[in-house]
Curated annotation (Swiss-Prot):
UniProt organism field: Schizosaccharomyces pombe (strain 972 / ATCC 24843)
Domain Protein kinase: 21-317
Entry-linked SMART domains: S_TKc
Name of one Pfam family that matches: Pkinase
GO cellular component: cytoplasm
PANTHER family from the UniProt entry: SCY1-LIKE PROTEIN 2 (PTHR12984:SF6), SCY1-RELATED S/T PROTEIN KINASE-LIKE (PTHR12984)
Keywords on record: Cytoplasm, Phosphoprotein
InterPro entries: ARM-like, ARM-type_fold, CIK-Related_Protein, Kinase-like_dom_sf, Prot_kinase_dom
BP term (GO), one: negative regulation of TORC1 signaling
CDD domains linked: PK_SCY1_like
Keyword set includes Iron: no
Official protein name in the record: Protein kinase domain-containing protein ppk32
Residues the record lists as Phosphoserine modifications: S632
Amino acid sequence: MLANALRLVSNSKKIKYDYDIQKENSVQVGPWTVYSASKKGTNEEVSVFTFDKKNLSTLLKRGSIDSNLKTNYVLELLRKDVSSLSRLRHPSLLQVVEPLEESKSSMSFVTRRIQSMLQDFIKSSNGGFSNYGSSANGKSSGNALEEVEIQKGLLQIIDGLVFLHGSAKVIHYNIRPSSVVVDAKGDWKLCGFSFSQSVESARYEFNDYDFGIPSSLQQSMDFLAPEYITHEIAGPESDVFSFGCLIYSIFNKNQSIINANNHLLSYEKEITSLNSPTFIESKNLPSENLKSLLKETLAVDPKQRASMFELERSPYFTGSAIAALRFLESFPEKLPSEKVSFMESLSKNLTTFPYRIQSQKILPTLLDHLNDQKLVPSLLPCIFEISKGLDSSIFSSKVFTAIFPIISAANSYPERVPLCIFQYMDCLKSKLPSGEFLSKIVPFIYGCFENSSLNVQTTSIQILGTLLDIIDVTTVKSSICPKLYHSFSVTNQLDVKVAILDTFNVFINQKFLDSFAIVDKLLPVLEKVKTREPTVVMGMVTVYISAGAIIPEETVHEQVIPRLWILSVSPSLSLEQYNKCMREIRSLSDAVQKSHAKKLQSKPSSVVPNRITTDPFSSQTKEATSKPSSISPNKATTNIFTSQASLSSQGVARETSSASSYRSYSQRASTPAVTAKSSFHYATPTSGLSNFNSVTPSSSASLYPPLIPSEARTPSVQPANRRVTTPVVNQNTVTSDSSNDLGGWKSLL
């Protein structure tokens, strides 16, 4: 006694110290209050079962039994329940993680995480069920239990009872909805062992129902076999009868096929009705196979009931969906080839399962086998498909942590793996926080640029255009585009080049590349392309046209349109492609032309200075503008001659001959007045005059009026830095008089 007392005291706070208990959320499982919890350090998800002894006096009502006896009786039932669960280990039984800890005020133990009792599960689904599988989006409609869920759960209870009756030699004696819990994976687990007994027990005593004790602490007559209640004869067949009552209650809002309200006389009447051959046939049940199953379990005569082994093979439990779930439960034991074949079939038929089955049963099993690299290509599609319906928080914590190592090393897997990840990129984008997506998924995309598979390369590039809603402009310009420029320059795969060009076009149209980035980075890359394959050429044409709407007009004139003409005459283009190029070029040219004309029209008009140009090869003087020149001819002549002040004496001597000739020419002039047609007539000089400085018109002289000799003007000294040549006259009409120094110019004075 002292040792037990010390043990209880020393362990009474272990659960409290080792687990974080969420007191705000709780469910009832029989007499136990159950809290969700997690183990400190490992974050293992568990449930903590607690019974508060302080409330026992409130629960126990006055009855025929002494209050202290009732209290001890109830506490012994609770201890037996936990000790039986701790001793019995089977996948279909509730698994105890921490044994019972008892103090003066409470009793507690820890199990694997559960959701609720089956009784509450049925109640929350309003007693509804569906035998039509999942809805169009793969999810169960409402809270109704799908029939395949029921089939799976019942098979799990059968497995547990087979273990109890066969290996453990134990009879449960308390099978009902409150003795079955649903765990976090949706599996049904058997509990409530307070009234269990050994098969070899000498006596099976049924205690009369005590209305002074809560019903959760007593057996329910509505779920007990008639031989046990009336004759105190029991065996495994008694559990079969209780199992039949459980099946019926699932389809009848937790109500057993017997409705005795724990009164013996009422019970006997109900059993008499049950013995009728048409009793079960009259019930509203979903299938004939289910009715046959109930007949095999609810026979009044124990000898006519089927064994648990026989129930397991009932036609009600046949079908592809339930067979797949049973295969999944034994998945670790299957051969690799069987696993691959099963997964291929499952991916095609996944939507036939209720979403609760997908998320709670199938998904955890698939995640547990991701360490098998041969199975990864078959597992990922199902994992992603199920993940579409998960909350973002659950996806991040449960699914993404399991698949991220595969995503990081995707290039080491067959191409099916990265292609599958790309296929479900929208799922990743919607479920992950944007920061986590950018830091973990975008690098995976970059890595696929260098993948050995052409499909993976092109898909990784094409996928970038779908991510612009979460990728900013800076990331595109500073991180993505440099990698695309490099890949575009080094790859010899035409499909990759076309994919990159398409991505550039998306970036431009979505305003992720500005004028500077296009002109400074993109156009030089495109200019180096030498291939003239039609797909590449047309891709480049599309990019150039899109860029032409953004970059300056001067760049369009200088770099884009010439390049488009070069590409358009590629001999590899078809007529249709060529015509398309021409349409695009004309469209761009027209747009630029209209834009430029509009700019010119918007400029303020300016006054153009009047000037007269002289054509040295024509006898006509042309006016540059419609207005007369503001410079008089005489003044213009004076300006020209004034520029000769720096002539050397030798130069002046040479020009005397030309001046004499010019005098002869001027004497023949009909009038000194300036007319619109006045001009000089120049002759070809003789060889003797070839070294003279002749006054010949130059292009710069066109800024001034024509030189008209005038006797009223005298030549003035010209600046040294300006040289004026004398006109060359015809030898046949003008002779040089070199002996007279300035005689030829005197006529001008």
